[in-house]
Amino acid sequence: MAGVNSAHRDAVVGLDLDQLGAWLSAAIPGAGTRVTATLITGGRSNLTYLVSDGRGEWIVRRPPLGHVLASAHDMGREYRVMTALCGTPIPVPRTLGSCDDPGVVGAPFYVMERVEGTSYHSAAELEALGADRTRTISTRLVETLGALHRVVPGDVGLADFGRPEGYLARQVARWKKQLDGSRTRDLPDADELHSRLAADVPAESGVGIVHGDFRLDNVLILDDQVTAVLDWEMATLGDPLSDLALMLVYKRFGVGASIGPDPRTAASGAPGFVSESEIIELYCAITDCDLTRFGFYLGLAAYKLAAVLEGIHYRYLQGQTVGEGFDRAGLLVPDLLEAGLEALKDDCG
């Protein structure tokens, strides 16, 4: 990388390129010490960079800047689950190394291979492909989620990756804690939704590897197939129906990397994208799930997403976000809380 200006190379928010280059050259055979990095747009929390030494390219992930919930940005867990899933039917990038020393780039981080594929964020991007291809892509997305939930955690070394017993109750408590720690305004529906969720937690429907943020713009697509599932920062062992419910809430509200308030502009609003009923039918055909208490799961998913977006809104107000779109993060929070309450009305508990 001769001729690269050091001051320019170091002007990448969240990375010390000299330190990172030295670490990469020691950890990855053939990697050079002088690297450049580009922040990949689209990430709402953990920061993702494309790093190159001029010969090879890698993806580096580190936690966000500033006010964060530590357990939601545990790089070691994200690295572990992807490493475990290599060789299974679930497409994940090959992991190359991790570092717990915050002295290298300012926080723990890990490195993985760069996988070919496109991350689709908007309806316009899918409309350019046509309805038939959009239907194929969205079908593959649901099939991938179903396949993930059929993986037996113990078979891939993840038997101790979480505590599935009491998962739903802990989720209710966890997102209340995050929302309380990030709230910047009066949100009366938040208190009511939490109270109703906490008062009627069902027994878990099953145990599986929960991704925690499964949606189209968290996968890569090549030739209409899923080539990689990304953003495992919330992964754990728990109730798989929580992933399905969150996918549907994302679809209803059009939430994705753009954090836009209009579902019509989100990728899941594109012509040909499988409908909610089709998503549920396809998923249940793969997993043989029981949807008796699905209203609770939808209410919890809406509460979780509201807490996540309010946390992003808080970081934006504090000047601790990197990238575009964060000024819109808080717009959907009140509507999500209201939708969560509506979902509980349809619960069969």
List each model region and its residues:
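All-alpha amphipathic helical-bundle segments outside canonical DNA-binding/catalytic cores
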Residues: 162-163, 289-301
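Juxta-kinase regulatory segment immediately upstream of eukaryotic protein kinase catalytic domains
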Residues: 2-31
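Catalytic-loop of the protein kinase fold
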Residues: 209-211, 216
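Activation of the activation-loop gatekeeper triad in protein kinase-fold domains
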Residues: 230-235
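ATP-binding pocket architecture of kinase catalytic cores
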Residues: 34-209, 225
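Active-site activation/catalytic loop segments of kinase-like enzymes and analogous catalytic loops
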Residues: 242-287, 301-319
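Helical subdomain adjoining the active site within ATP-dependent kinase catalytic cores
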Residues: 289, 293, 307-349
